[in-house]
Structure formats: C-alpha cells, structure tokens
C-alpha cells in the first residue's frame, strides 16, 4: 500500500521544497480528498455538481492540475475502501494542519454538503463528526456553516 502511494505521489504531485514535509503534505492532501469524497457520498446521491465541487476544491486548495487532482481523488477512493472509518484520515489532519486549516476543511465539507442546495441529515452528521475528530470548536463549526450558506446564498 505504501509503495502504491509513493508511486502515485511521485507521478502526480509536485514535490515541496523541504524533503521531510513531502510525505506529510501528500498525506494531508489524501486525507482531505478522502473526507471530501465521503461527504459527497453521505446522502447516497452523488450529483455531477458535487463531483465538480470536490474536484475544484482539491485543485484550488492544493494548487494541483486537473490531472493531478483526478489522480489524487482516484487514489483517495481506493484508500476509502480499505479504511475502517474517518480516524485514518482525521488523525493525519490533526498531526499536520493548524487549527485554521482544520476549520477550512470543515468549511470545505459544508461546501460539498450544500452543493445540491439541500442539507441531508447524514451530511450534517458527518461534518459534525469530523469536526469533533479534528477538534474544531462548535462555534467555528457553526461559523463555517454560516459562511458557506452566505457564500452560496442559501
């Protein structure tokens, strides 16, 4: 599994300037992508708009090309199949992201959840659960939700 990940990152993700941070950054990209995919699947109805929003979020957040983002998402889907829960991904986020970056992940999850203009109870539960797992305070969880609703004019 580690070998497949190393092949993936060497082929599709630009290396960072500091060698020791490479794996960390790549793992964070994978963890974030996996959570976004899980959010897209949370309401059991995956729309084209949700797929586009996930792709756009990954491209923007990590400054990746469409090809790199597509490869990252494909690899993340494979990792999700092997995962037993969110902990595998949230533990990486806890280790590698600042508090502000964690709040941004929650905001990204809300963006995916609201893409179809409807918030399913399973989507809200997932965002709440991830926020708890990455230690985002309730006020920041709510503020992220309100920012996204305002941005999307809901």
How would you name each of these model-derived features?
Residues 1-38, 48-154:
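Small-residue-enriched hydrophobic alpha-helices in membranes
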């Amino acid at each position: 599994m580690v070998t497949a990940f190393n092949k993936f990152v060497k082929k599709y993700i630009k290396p960072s300037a500091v060698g020791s941070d490479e794996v960390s950054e790549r793992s964070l990209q994978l963890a974030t992508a996996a959570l976004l995919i899980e959010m897209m699947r949370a309401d059991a109805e995956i729309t084209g708009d949700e797929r586009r929003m996930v792709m756009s979020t990954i491209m923007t957040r990590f400054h990746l090309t469409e090809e790199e983002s597509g490869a990252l998402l494909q690899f993340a889907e494979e990792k999700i199949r092997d995962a037993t829960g969110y902990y595998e991904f949230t533990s990486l986020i806890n280790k590698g992201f600042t508090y502000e970056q964690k709040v941004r992940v929650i905001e990204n999850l809300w963006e995916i959840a609201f893409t179809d203009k409807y918030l399913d109870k399973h989507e809200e539960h997932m965002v709440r659960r991830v926020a708890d797992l990455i230690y985002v305070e309730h006020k920041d969880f709510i503020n992220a939700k309100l920012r996204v609703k305002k941005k999307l004019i809901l």
